[in-house]
Amino acid sequence: MAGNTFGQIFTVTTFGESHGAGLGCIIDGCPPGLELSEADIQFDLDRRKPGTSRHVTQRREADQVEILSGVFEGKTTGTPIALLIRNTNQRSKDYGNIATAFRPGHADYTYWHKYGTRDYRGGGRSSARETAARVAAGAVAKKWLKEKFGTEITAYVTQVGEKKIRFEGSEHISQNPFFAANQSQIAELEHYMDGVRKSLDSVGAKLHIEAANVPVGLGEPVFDRLDAEIAYAMMGINAVKGVEIGAGFDSVTQRGSEHGDELTPQGFLSNHSGGILGGISTGQDICVNIAIKPTSSIATPRRSIDIHGNPVELATRGRHDPCVGLRAAPIAEAMLALVLIDHALRHRAQNADVAADTPDISRSDK
């Protein structure tokens, strides 16, 4: 299997399966001298881990990270960083009924055709459990970006199924199980998700991700444009079916006089571009939206076929998220961080000596 490595200078290679002994990643290209501990990484893993509320999978995993290499006396050495997360709560017997049949909406059918074999236990490598390794790597990237530029990356859920969530303040995000920037709608969301779960069905979600204090100049036109790489990173997350940068699809109904962000000596007058022009960061906040499909694993019987092509009916057993988007915020933050650190290092490698005479107006209001 190819395609398990992300990045060009700051590279991350993930490994492991949902019901294997463990999973993890190798980070190569991390600058030396970054103070790093397991606690720095654990914070984001705890935000992502399963079993934290009745609205997510009840699989109980500590997701305790171990740093195996690349850190000495509390600082990165510049050598590869190996991170390991052991699986402790597998329940593989729940998946016996899909050993020879394909779950609708899952990667079972495509993995079988591509590789001629598959680990059917919890989806194996195709499981969203793999994203724990990305969150671990992203925590390292976030720490470096914050110390280097003051970059802050925040994600929150803006819609669950047909329920839109109003933004009331980022301080609310960590105070509820929905990663919602809103406390007044929590009871409504609790009731809604209880109904979804009781109906043996699932729903999708929409998330907003922002990166503040991003330096101007990141991105490598033409094929490695910053927005192109962000879209690539977000689409690599399980269940993501759509990505918007800035105004996104609303750009269709905007006029050019509205969409084009005007510049003044005091700063930009708007940010419909989402902080990226010509594939290069403007220094404004980078704004991304992602759409996540409903969880494919549901207890409602559905039609499918077995490996011989015979018709079957499957009801998925096991412990699953009725809305996988509820745990996606730390994953989306991690992927945006991995894009930004890689491009920051690429920019430094080629353009460290470039100095423009024009003021950086993105900083004029900060």
Swiss-Prot record:
The keyword Oxidoreductase does not apply. Gene3D superfamilies: Chorismate synthase AroC. It catalyses: 5-O-(1-carboxyvinyl)-3-phosphoshikimate = chorismate + phosphate. Pfam families: Chorismate_synt. Keywords: Amino-acid biosynthesis, Aromatic amino acid biosynthesis, FAD, Flavoprotein, FMN, Lyase, NADP. Reduced FMN (FMNH(2)). Its EC number is 4.2.3.5. Pathway: Metabolic intermediate biosynthesis; chorismate biosynthesis; chorismate from D-erythrose 4-phosphate and phosphoenolpyruvate: step 7/7. The keyword NADP applies. Its cofactor is FMNH2. NADP(+) binds at R48, R54. Homotetramer. NCBIfam families: aroC (TIGR00033), PRK05382.1 (NF003793). This is Chorismate synthase. It comes from Neisseria gonorrhoeae (strain NCCP11945).
